[in-house]
Every structure is written in C-alpha cells, then in structure tokens.
Amino acid sequence: MRARFLSTLLLPVTLILMPAGTPRHAPAGPRQPAGPRFGLSFPAARSAAPVDGRLFLMISTDSSAEPRFQISDGQNTQVIFGIDVEGLKPGQEATLDGEVPGYPVKRLADIPTGRYWVQGLLNRYQTFRRADGHVVKLPPDQGEGQQWNSKPGNFYSRPRWVLIDPGKDEVIRIALDQEIPPIPDPPETKYVKHVKIQSKLLSDFWGRPMYLGAHVLLPEGFDAHPNARYPLAVFHGHFPYTFGGWRETPPDPNVPCVYSERFSLDCYNRIQDQAAYQLYRDWTGPGFPRVLAIEIAHPTPYYDDSYAVNSANNGPYGDAIMRELIPHIEQRFRGIGQGYARFTYGGSTGGWEAMAVQMFYPDDFNGAWIACPDPIDFRAYTVVNLYEDGNAYYYDSHWRRTPRPGFRNWLGQVRSTLEEMNRREAVLGSRGRSGDQWDIWQAVYSPVGPDGYPKPIWDKMTGEVDRDVAQYWREHYDLSYILRRDWKTLGPKLKGKLHIYVGDMDNYYLNNAVYLVEEFLKGTRSPYYDGEVDYGDRAEHCWNGDHTRPNAYSRLRYHQMFIPRFMEQIRKNHPANPDTLSWRY
C-alpha cells in the first residue's frame, strides 16, 4: 500500500466533491460562467501533435515547494482540480471554470479570495490496443513508477503567485511550457545489477512492447565461486529505482538532517543511510547466507506495481514474472531454479504479493514472509465488508451517516476517511486512472467494464458497492476465501510456508483481514497450516514481526530478518538430492 500523507497532524477532515468532469477544452462556445477561469495550454515546442491526458490545476498557500508535490491524503494537502482532455492541440486552451471538481475543495468556485501559489500539469496518456479488443487511453510508465507529478514527458508550468477573486470575471492563463526530463538508468556496482527484458506475454496483451525489470543483489563471493548456484529471495514491494536500502560506502556524517513526520524522528535520513550501509556490511560479512536477492520492477499503466498476478485489466503479469523474468534471472546469475530454493517476502503491497504468489504458484516457492499485507480477506477490505455492506463510505444506517475511517494513528485518531481518499483519486483520474492505491486494487481484481476500463467495485462519488463485482473479486483474488475453498488441494502445498505479521494498530486497518485469515488457519486440519501469525502491540503500518525494535528501524531490516530463515526452511523442506552445498562457503 502506498502512503499519500505529508503530515502527521491528526485532525479529522470533511470533504464533498462533485463527479469528475468531462473535457472542457473547447476553445469556443457559449459564454463561461462569471468568475475566474483558468486557461491552460502547451506550446508547439512541447508537442506539435495533439495530446490526450488528465489536466491538473493546483492551488497552494505554501510556496516552499511546487504545488505538484503538495497533494496528499494528509492534513497539509493543498488543492487540485482535474479534467480529461482529448486531442488537445498546441496553443489550444483547455478551460477550467468554477464548476470543475477538486480535492479537497468541492469546486474551483469555492476558492476564497486570496493570493495563491499556482501550477498546471498535464499527465499525458497514450492509446493501447489490447488483445481483448478494447482500446484504452492510459499513462504509460516512463521509469518513474507511475508518479504523475514526476513522470518524464509530462508538461507543466513554473509555479507563480496568482490573485484569485471569485467576484472577478477573468481568464487566468497558464502556459505548460516545461517538460519533465527522462530519468537516468541506475548505476551498477560489483553487487547490484539491473535486468530488463521485453515480455512476450505482456506485449501480446497490451499490443505494444512491454518490459519487466529487476534489481539483483549478488552474494559475496559470486565471482570467486563460478560453480556455485544460489537460492533466490524475491523481495516484493513498490516500484524500485534500484535495489533499495543498500549502500556500499559509509554515510556522510555531515549530511543535513531530514525530520520524519511519519515516525517523529529527527535525522531519519541518517538512520536510513546507516541501515543501508549495515546491510552491505552484513551481506558481505562472514556467516550471511549466500543468495540472490531481487526486487522486481513491474509498473503497469495503472500503477507502480502489477501486484504480481494475472489480471483481466493489467494482463498476465503473474505468468510473465514467473515464466519469463525469474527464469531469465536464474539462468544469467546461476540460480538453482527450483521451487525449494525460492522464497518471497515483503510488506504492505509486497506482503499481499508474497502471499498471493505463494498461493497461486505454490510449487514455485518454499515460503512466504508476509508483513502488513494489503487486504487478504475482502470481508475486511480495510473497514468494508464487500459482501454485506451497501456503502463503502458510510456505515449502513437508516438515520445516521457515520463516515468510515481510512487512516488512523496508533492511538486510533482518524485523519482521513475512505471517502476523502477515494475522492482525491477521482480528481487525479477518471475511469480508475489515478495511478493510486484504491484504483490499482480495482484494476487488479475487477473484470473489464464495457468501456475497456476496470469495472468499479463501488461508485467513486457515492460509495455504493457493486455486489456483482464483489463476487468476481471473491472468486479470483480474495486470498482468505481461496484458502478456505481450496484447502483440500492447496493446503498440502502450503504447509509451513505462510508467515504473517501485522501491527494491531495498522494505519489502514489491515490487521482486520489478518484476524479472519488467522481464524481459518488455526482451525485447519489435514494438514494443519503449521505457519505463523503474529501481531505487534500498538504497532502501525508496516510492522514486520520484530518485537525488539521500533517500526521505524525494523522496516529497514527485512533482508537481515528473513533471509536467514529461508535457510532454515531449505533444511526442513527440500527434495531428494538438493543443491545445499555449492552456495555455502
């Protein structure tokens, strides 16, 4: 799960938005409503051809950063408005009038008189002609991990101060004359290597070349032991630019301190740097298991991550990773290439993925270490029971209208509701194209709608749940339901392989689903699941099973925590005549 908070203030917020608008970029037509309007355009120097995409206007009271970097689910969020544009020509103005919906302000006309730090941005779409016959317009990843505010090729304006007066009938013009530059390839080292392949499976689905990548951490002694073959540790998580949490040089003691609002820690950047260097020291030191560790780069046109499973909307990412990417890595870097010597681990999104791939490809992995997983039982889709609740935003009641919480702190104080979080996404993109958390769950789990985009699990404006879509989700991606449904055949393949950890005050209520899964697992027979479910007392997202350190520190130690446990699993569960010696040196 990808956090979208810029502050740890814990005040409740109320938000009401209008539905995401239709394109308003016609250069001529009836007179616009009175009041300020914004006319956004890009010059031919940026593109001589018309473009499609989502056009944003951002209004801020804070000039310490560009407004495009100030939009979040937190209390310090600034304001954003968005419309779709199709075939917008260079020099042609797209007009955002007072009725354009925004977040967290209802509409542009509701901005009070004042001087604001204003910026425009165009998140550009491309046309995909998929193998299923649908033609869709989506923002392809450009190496940034599906981040609209830093995507190479997107047009934007330099921010400037603008006086907005709701009583003044005027057009405020903004030129999107800047373009986000390409992202350079990450450097390689003796230990860190980068892999990129064109996937035939994904290219066939999307109707254009599509790629998968991975960052590979080689074991100490890799070159000195050319006959060694290694176990594979697959670390799942969000889009990685390079192998995360790793550095081969001592940290600079004079680097300026950066305060972490999330953990209320000063100089947290120094803590991260030191932990990254400690991983290098442990990894290269005596006694650490010699394995290949990889982080997979699999962004889709919907998100920074495919969730590593096959999907009607995303395509066959699960098979592409398992049948194309991983065999390529194991062949190139001398992996053992058998299920007993593969392991998967991760937290949040990576936690769900670790559990899902262990279940969907049970013979290909020998264990999953699952931290703070995204909802693994859709009876507790955070705080919504998709099979019984009628509305995702409010508790069902004839007389009351109580909002469902979306984010809390360790004391249970709510700082964002489910409605607010989803309304932000509605402004960022129509038809599930926000590139954010709730929309990617929908893109992964939903059937394809008649328009070629993911069929909504609920109405983004009202929160009304679609029970038919929920049933599709249950049969295909509700991991808890699938365990219960298929335990007779799946259970023997999963015995001793599921290890689940979560804080009992997870910020996103992800512990609720774990309780339901634990209830089933502890009651299993023939076989008993023989794994582990553990909880961190008052621990927030993303607790990973370490009772000895605060979450701010343990989250930096996944590899040291779990890779030694993989070796224990090989000793307990392996076929006849396994390779358990060549990589032990």
Which residues make up each language-model segment?
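General helical structural elements
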Residues: L6-T8, A28, E419, V427-L428
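Bacterial N-terminal signal peptides
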Residues: S7-M18
